[in-house]
A protein has these predicted regions:
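Glycine-rich beta-strand-turn "strand-cap" elements at beta-sheet edges
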Residues: 2, 39-50, 76-101
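Short, flexible segments with low predicted structural confidence
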Residues: 2-3, 18-19, 35-37
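Short, well-ordered beta-strand segments in beta-rich or mixed alpha/beta enzyme
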Residues: 3-10, 39-70
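Short, surface-exposed ligand-recognition loops at beta-strand->loop->(often short) alpha-helix junctions
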Residues: 11-20
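Hydrophobic alpha-helical segments with strong N-terminal bias
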Residues: 19, 23, 44, 71-73
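An amphipathic, aromatic/His-enriched active-site/gating alpha helix that lines ligand/cofactor pockets
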Residues: 25, 29-39, 57-91
Length: 101
């Protein structure tokens, strides 16, 4: 059963560019190495550029565990987590409707 999640966080304003680089590295890893992470969208808020939201879809629990234990996720944790103003908020969702297959 697919797992849908979001991750929301805010970093110190001085760390926005560094955070964007870390996000791009993580997403590139997901794209090339995690075939069962079937959706990964990382967004930056327009009005408050230090706020970010990621939208994720994992094919199953194994795909989620693969993502969480990847070297790229570990690197993201090391570089971004210390820069957040509050802990990253992860939420899991149930899909109600979509235009995507």
């Amino acid at each position: 059963m697919p797992i849908y999640m979001t991750a929301e966080y805010q970093v110190h304003p001085s760390q926005v560019e560094k955070t964007k680089g870390s996000v791009r590295q993580l997403v590139e890893h997901v794209k090339t190495s995690e075939p069962f992470t079937t959706l990964y969208i990382a967004q930056q808020q327009i009005l408050i550029p230090s706020r970010f939201m990621h939208i994720l879809r994992f094919e199953d629990e194994a795909a989620l565990k693969t993502h969480q234990s990847s070297p790229a996720s570990a690197q993201f944790v090391q570089t971004v987590y210390p820069q957040t103003l509050k802990p990253i908020e992860f939420m899991e969702y149930k899909l109600i409707a979509t235009i995507n297959p």
